[in-house]
Amino acid sequence: KISFVKHKFNELNEIIIFFIFFLIIAVHIASKLNLGWDAKWFWYIKSLFYYQNQTINELSNYTFNDFHPHLGSYFWAFFRSLSINEYEYTGRLFYAFLYLISILIITSNIFKKKINNLILFSLLITITYRYDYFSGLQEVLIFSLLLVVSKLMYDLYEFKNTKNILFILLGLNSILWIKSEGIAYALIIFVVINFYPKIKIKSKIIFSIIFFLLIILKILIYKYYQIKINDQPYYLNYILNLDLNLIIYKIKNIFIFLTYNSLKNIIFFITGILIIFNFNQLKKINYNFLIFICFILNIIFIFCAYLFRDMEIIYSLKTTMDRIVFSSSGLYLLYILKFFTDRKKSKF
């Protein structure tokens, strides 16, 4: 009975801390009047379509930016319509809720003592929260979903719980419908899971078939509503005609901006340092090896995304690299936590 009461008391503390942070962030979001640039021109306008009872059919007429997925804008409109006053910012509170839930999920079982988990939960919010991410931009949704998926991937590796594959697929499908680059994150996770040594070939085949069916389904829906699959400035002719000087110039600046924003984000930077620190453990397929594959593919994606884009490189890096690094870091936060807690346990 004592242990039961203690367990319920800990759960109550968890709920109280969660809603205290949610209230603080909600007040902060409500006190800000500015939306992010992409939010003003893309995501908020799309949310208005849904808010005014329009559908994806009408949204396909928004030719200025019809190709970006619409799920984040739908959440914005849906939760706005559920609120009492239906102010614009109330829809964005769902972003904060998902963000807090995702951090709670990865911190709930790091330590045996619940109080330590709550301290860690509070610390991570303090480190990662910035209003800019909640100004209508979609990267916080990607970050949050990647946190949840990373937890599912860890449990799949550690405990061989193949039921997690279904939930991973649901997470990847959501990511596909939030931003265009969601396909890159989904493919990275797809490749990494197929490296898992403890999953049967049959399960991997089923996972792969369903994964590609989800991508095909998205393409078919876009075709049906006559929406461009992608309208980003990537052209085969431009890629084939890149000269060596421009390639070197772009790679140099990508490296500089990636390093700078990794230091600002710190999660991405620490991941790179830990992978180097654990390099001797990469000879066999273990959790460190899987994170290494994930991180390398992530770096390749970032470099390719900017290298082959027909846009002024400095402007492109200044306006987007910070958000790319932030959303990507959702893949690695749990890895960092596990690294330090496992080392602490090994000393005793």
Predicted stretch roles:
Residues Y131, N164-S180, A186-V191, L213:
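Membrane-interface alpha helices of multi-pass inner-membrane proteins
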Residues D66, H70-S73, L82-I101:
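Loop-to-helix entry region of an early transmembrane alpha helix in multi-pass inner-membrane enzymes
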Residues K1-V27, K114, I206, F279-I293, ...:
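Start-transfer (signal-anchor) and selected internal transmembrane alpha helices
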Residues K32, S203-F279, N298-I302:
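Membrane-lumen/periplasm interface segments of specific transmembrane helices
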Residues K8-F9, E158-F159, Y185-F211, L282-K283:
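Perimembrane helix-loop-helix junctions
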Residues Y99-F111, N194-F195, K264-F292, I296, ...:
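Hydrophobic, aromatic-rich transmembrane alpha-helices
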Residues F18-F21, L93-I110, I115-M153, I165-N173:
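Membrane-embedded helix bundles of polyisoprenyl
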Residues K32-K46, Q52-F75, E86:
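Extracytoplasmic catalytic/substrate-binding loops of multi-pass membrane glycan-assembly enzymes
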